[in-house]
Amino acid sequence: MGEDSYLCLSEEIKKKLEEYSEKDGYDLDSLICSRRHGGLTYNDIIILPGYIDFEVNSVSLESHITKKIVLKTPFMSSPMDTVTESDMAINLALLGGIGVIHHNCTIEEQTEMVRKVKKFENGFITSPIVLSLNHRVRDVRRIKEELGFSGIPITDTGQLNGKLLGIVTSRDIQFHNNDESFLSEVMTKDLVTGSEGIRLEEANEILRSCKKGKLPIVDKEGNLTALLSRSDLMKNLHFPLASKLPDSKQLICAAAVGTRPDDRIRLKHLVEAGLDIVVLDSSQGNSIYQINMIKWIKKEFPNLEVIAGNVVTREQAANLISAGADALRVGMGSGSICITQEIMAVGRPQATAVYAVSEFASKFGVPTIADGGIENIGHITKALALGASAVMMGNLLAGTTESPGQYYYRDGQRLKSYRGMGSIDAMEHLSGKNKGDNAASSRYFGEADTIRVAQGVSGSVIDKGSLHVYVPYLRTGLQHSLQDIGVQNLTELRKQVKEKNIRFEFRTVASQLEGNVHGLDSYQKKLWS
């Protein structure tokens, strides 16, 4: 962009261009002007094309989602009970994004979901399941059935830091019919081990060469200190974009909590399970409750990243940034299943909100996450151009194989349920159990209300297939969008927007109709293959 885009021009043509007092279109500051255009949504704006001098596969989508954590794909799934549980969180993290596990469930259920994410891709497993010689084959089968893995080290104490004696894998017991046999009869004793302090890359190389399923890590005395899994090595090869911590190589895990006293207890359990990012889940984040919660978290868990929100104005953002937020969620009433703007008459059009909050937060190095109203790749591109570091999606990811719930058929279409956390259905979830665990009511400050006021609806969405096809489609589409704009990464996108080299246009209703399919008797809109 900028001067580089004039490299192919003759001096005469360049001079003629420079005779114009202004470039085509608007700069972003001029476009997002409430006095001129009112509040704008994503459909109200379009980005003008730039100059291409690079291949699309060279476009990097790396971006901060908090002050410390960087993703290779700036996609997040919303903490909704029909969008994100452990399956979504694991698979989105493998593809370079991150899923935020909802909290419309018991503390135990949410903690177990976090634990599943952290255990999925372990790097060095520092708290492996360990058995002793006194355990039996049935114990290994039970662990396999309950936790989904085998390859269990055997020590003299049956605990970590005991003397390593052997290992029992699924192959050792595959054709062994006596479940009462002691493990000493079936375990493998000829082991390949790594020494304590070995680098992960070196340990992975040993696994490659020895062709074993597990690599026990032992100290000088032969005591077990950690374990490395071959299955994790394969995951590293198959998912190079995976969102992982650089030291442990575990998948990054995020989960939502509220701001009630009980949520402090909930958060302690989540942190013990390995939580990396907490999302404070509220439709209106500018409250004394959230400010106090941020301060408490920063005191109790200084290494935990805090995403606060939701906010739509600079003034709201200022309070949460001052309290110590590491990132902000932006959006109020813009989601497809949200009726806050209609019912409460409070909120803000999403494009204007993302721009206003992102522009202010960037002065303090605080990333923003555009949450709500994302319907397609174009909306993702616009949100990032408006200043967001990532997008949070509910509707766009609901209906995938990895989202919670069962498929059902209606009129020949395969569907999944999708509901807003402000819907009556979500608010009544767990009503027969502990009402204190209902996140939907607390999110809208309504847990003490005798009459529930809905700020969302329940509905259904069409089957979108697996994330492993759908997310690469979104990712590749975003790369093509950035190529059309003429930037190779998101840092350059924000820089060129700030320097007013990337230009925008306001779209009238007629221009929006023109920019969509029109003039056909019928058509089929197939978006990917």
UniProtKB/Swiss-Prot annotation:
The active site is at C338, R443. Its cofactor is K(+). GO terms for biological process: GMP biosynthetic process; GTP biosynthetic process. K(+) binds at G333, G335, C338, E514, G515. CDD domains: CBS_pair_IMPDH, IMPDH. NAD(+) binds at D281, S282, S283, G331, M332, G333. Gene3D superfamilies: Aldolase class I. Mycophenolic acid (MPA) is a non-competitive inhibitor that prevents formation of the closed enzyme conformation by binding to the same site as the amobile flap. In contrast, mizoribine monophosphate (MZP) is a competitive inhibitor that induces the closed conformation. MPA is a potent inhibitor of mammalian IMPDHs but a poor inhibitor of the bacterial enzymes. MZP is a more potent inhibitor of bacterial IMPDH. MPA is a potent inhibitor in culture. Keywords: CBS domain, Cytoplasm, GMP biosynthesis, Metal-binding, NAD, Oxidoreductase, Potassium, Purine biosynthesis, Repeat. One of its GO terms (cellular component) is cytoplasm. This is Inosine-5'-monophosphate dehydrogenase. The N-terminus is blocked. Its EC number is 1.1.1.205. GO terms for molecular function: IMP dehydrogenase activity; metal ion binding; nucleotide binding. Residues 124-185, 187-243 form the CBS domain. IMP binds at S336, D371, G372, G373, G394, N395, Y418, R419, G420, M421, G422, Q455. Belongs to the IMPDH/GMPR family. It catalyses: IMP + NAD(+) + H2O = XMP + NADH + H(+). The gene is GUA1. It comes from Pneumocystis carinii. Catalyzes the conversion of inosine 5'-phosphate (IMP) to xanthosine 5'-phosphate (XMP), the first committed and rate-limiting step in the de novo synthesis of guanine nucleotides, and therefore plays an important role in the regulation of cell growth. Homotetramer. The keyword rRNA-binding does not apply. NCBIfam families: IMP_dehydrog (TIGR01302). It is found in: Cytoplasm. Pfam families: CBS, IMPDH.
